[in-house]
Amino acid sequence: MDRINTSAAPPTSPDWERLRTDFPLLQRHVHGKPLIYFDNANTAQKPQAVITATDTFYRRHNANISRAVHTLGTEATEAYEATRTALATLLNAPTHELVLCSGTTFAINLIAYSWALPRLRAGDVILVSRMEHHANIVPWQLIAERTGARIQVADILPNGTLDLDALHTLMTPQVKLLAITHVSNVLGTVNPIHDICRQARQRGITTVVDGSQAAPHRHIDIPAIGCDFYAITGHKLYGPTGTGALWARREHLHIMPPFLGGGEMIKEVSFDGTLFNTPPHKFEAGTPNIAGFIGLRAAVDYVRRIGIEQIETRETELLAHLTEELQKIDGMRLFGTAPNKAAVVSFMIEGTHAHDLATLLDLEGVAIRSGQHCAHPLLQYYGVTATCRASLAFYNTHEEIERFIAALLKVRKLLG
């Protein structure tokens, strides 16, 4: 299959302006103004390497995977499995412990119904944090309703950090599962996930980590983290939508029943019963998003070529600049000021509504998120119904931050 060379060693000092030109959509104008895309926690833009990889698959190699011996089928299967290998390398995890799926939401539901549902009983506790995305709350509520288990919530401190003392106190013998985000999608808080998982493991608590917001911005080392499950989403990692992965310990994958039934997840079928495939394919029923996963492989290679440490350094600098400028604005309220943060800033300006700000900013060519960010309990903690969220990626610039602040001041004046 045609290869795109995106696996070269990271440069000593990336040329961020040149890398920005790899993203076609960033060249757009919106309402006659150059686009400022500050909604990267929602989804990241795609480099040309990803677009080309997906297009090339459909033009030259389109076939189903694991179902044919012809050349196209072999090429498609090899390219698809190469994505599993690339993700395993990114996460420092074995390929046979990596389930390819549509994203973090699917991954967490897979854990909920294949691992938790058969094991939890009345009186057991599922522990979550206040800062979780709904995808790491609602599945556990559904499981609790069916099993009689209870959900307990570890709260946060006013600056948006997790209350670690409270979390450790809640780790009682009744807790069977801890589901926690690595990085908050609203606050940007980077949780001390290594310590949290170590504490949980010492107490015999199974850990589920939502890594959706972490994988694009932080180095992930699964063995070092020490969790039981780790889920990521491809479209936030500069890859196509409908892609993602679940890493799970081998011992869990072997005892978990399939979540969905169909082709690929079986070895043999008769009317007397079915012999299931081995993990991870046991959990990959049906035809997947083949082109999407081939695009995801290109995205992973692209990120590795830049270097995730370089990306983190770049985004930390951008975050410091953005935060400093926002703090100069009268009436500004920032949500989440943890010392260890990803490049996410949620904010409100006194006397304005988040949706009004975001709508008028769009007319200035600025794309940010407004609303509750799929985190209702977190916003309830802060006593607000909505916030604005600006989230950055390495391809954003200091000049964009200055233009964003100018646009924000203009909009604020319009709103009185």
Curated annotation (Swiss-Prot):
EC numbers on record: 2.8.1.7
SS bonds (residue pairs): none
Residue positions where N6-(pyridoxal phosphate)lysine is found in the record: 236
Gene Ontology process terms (BP): cysteine metabolic process
Catalytic machinery residues: 374
Pfam families the UniProt entry points to: Aminotran_5 (PF00266)
Molecular functions (GO terms): cysteine desulfurase activity; pyridoxal phosphate binding
InterPro entries: Aminotrans_V_dom (IPR000192), Aminotrans_V_PyrdxlP_BS (IPR020578), Cys_dSase_SufS (IPR010970), Cysteine_dSase (IPR016454), PyrdxlP-dep_Trfase (IPR015424), PyrdxlP-dep_Trfase_major (IPR015421), PyrdxlP-dep_Trfase_small (IPR015422)
Catalytic activity: (sulfur carrier)-H + L-cysteine = (sulfur carrier)-SH + L-alanine
Key words, A-Z: Pyridoxal phosphate, Transferase
Origin: domain of life: Bacteria
Physiological role: Catalyzes the removal of elemental sulfur and selenium atoms from L-cysteine, L-cystine, L-selenocysteine, and L-selenocystine to produce L-alanine.
NCBIfam families on file: sufS (TIGR01979)
PANTHER family (alphabetical): CYSTEINE DESULFURASE, CYSTEINE DESULFURASE 1, CHLOROPLASTIC
Family: Belongs to the class-V pyridoxal-phosphate-dependent aminotransferase family. Csd subfamily.
Name listed for the protein in its UniProt record: Probable cysteine desulfurase
The organism of origin for this protein: Xylella fastidiosa (strain 9a5c)
